Amino acid sequence: MVTYEVTAVVRPELADAYEAYMRRHIPELLATGWFVRASLARSTGNRYRIRYHARDQQSVDRYIAEDAPRLRADFAEHFPAGVELTREVWQTLEEWQP
């Protein structure tokens, strides 16, 4: 499993709009077919983490090449300022469950 993780730091006055946007954006991203599930989490200081889980690295690479430019442009149109993003790809080495 490969995780494509996006961290966002959002100005306080944009937090409600950001959350509403992400509730539409995440299903659109999942509809590309490259990811099998996603989660949205919030921490203190209007910091958010979105995790998109893919079956393999090829799926993440194809998403970045084929669909990310369009979805990122839409995000930038809605939030031209006030949201700082970082993106990372994580390779799952092992998982445990009780």
Give the positions of each predicted feature:
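Short amphipathic alpha-helical segments
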Residues: 14-37
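Residue-level signal for secondary-structure boundary sites
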Residues: 14-16, 58-60, 95
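Serine/threonine-rich low-complexity intrinsically disordered regions
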Residues: 11-14, 72
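Glycine-rich beta-strand-turn "strand-cap" elements at beta-sheet edges
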Residues: 36-49, 74-98
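Short, well-ordered beta-strand segments in beta-rich or mixed alpha/beta enzyme
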Residues: 2-9, 37-68
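Short amphipathic alpha-helices in soluble, non-transmembrane regions
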Residues: 20-23, 62-73
